[in-house]
Amino acid sequence: MATKPQDANTTSREAITSKADSPPRPTALIFDSGVGGLSVYQEIRQLLPNLHYIYAFDNVAFPYGEKSGEFIVERVLEIVTAVQQSHPLAIVVIACNTASTVSLPALRERFAFPVVGVVPAIKPAVRLTRNGVVGLLATRATVHASYTLDLIARFATDCKIELLGSSELVEVAETKLHGGVVPLEVLKKILHPWLSMREPPDTIVLGCTHFPLLTEELAQVLPEGTRMVDSGAAIARRTAWLISSQENVISSQDENIAYCMALDEDTDALLPVLQSYGFPKLQKLPI
């Protein structure tokens, strides 16, 4: 029997469910520069398993940690607008700390649907620390963002905050999700400023959504008993509340889908990973 030719802008395997089997669901867009936002998506899906999920990642401009704020704002607006033209969005989650620190005001000004951002979990980390030293591990853009410095000034006046910015760690997380090995020596080199301290942080804020993907490896390198905190669960609760507060939300019977900005060998290799997260199809977003 003949099979339908596959669109050049789409990568997929046999659909997990058909539209007829899927109940109507509000549509949630989860966006990140890379695949780190899948850690946030996991938390949201645990609370809201019946939403229609779209995952979009900017593999053309990745990583955002080294980009200017102006570029990031324009890029995120362009991508969210393109997704909105094809899907009735009920909510957007910017699952990228770097993008959240600069793009939320512009997104909320342009769109009527709620937009949720990810910010470093400094406040809960301050409550958890035992030695009064909290480490913020993030991209350099997030570490130096005025929003981050404001959070520290508001919630961490009684603690010592050690800042460590690393884009290399983002690349390491991407490599792991693509099936690569995480060399512990690389992590030790990245974390050396903390590991060499007489009294290192006992609580670490994972200030990039890629970093929860590396918690097992980080735990092998950091001092025993170090706590790691991220914003995933809090973002999931906020998303659930905003969804439940909406009325007359347009629902979708479409299956979950992932969008990238360019299809290549790397995205082909990533498809099985995305399918394991519940995204049977990966498609190039027309922008």
Curated annotation (Swiss-Prot):
SUPFAM superfamilies reported for this sequence: Aspartate/glutamate racemase
Domain of life: Bacteria
Keyword Cell wall biogenesis/degradation tagged: yes
Keyword Transcription regulation: no
Biased composition (Polar residues): 1-15
Active site, per annotation: C96 (proton donor/acceptor), C208 (proton donor/acceptor)
Catalytic class of the enzyme: isomerase
Binding site for substrate: D32, S33, Y64, G65, N97, T98, T209, H210
Record's protein name: Glutamate racemase
Gene behind the chain: murI
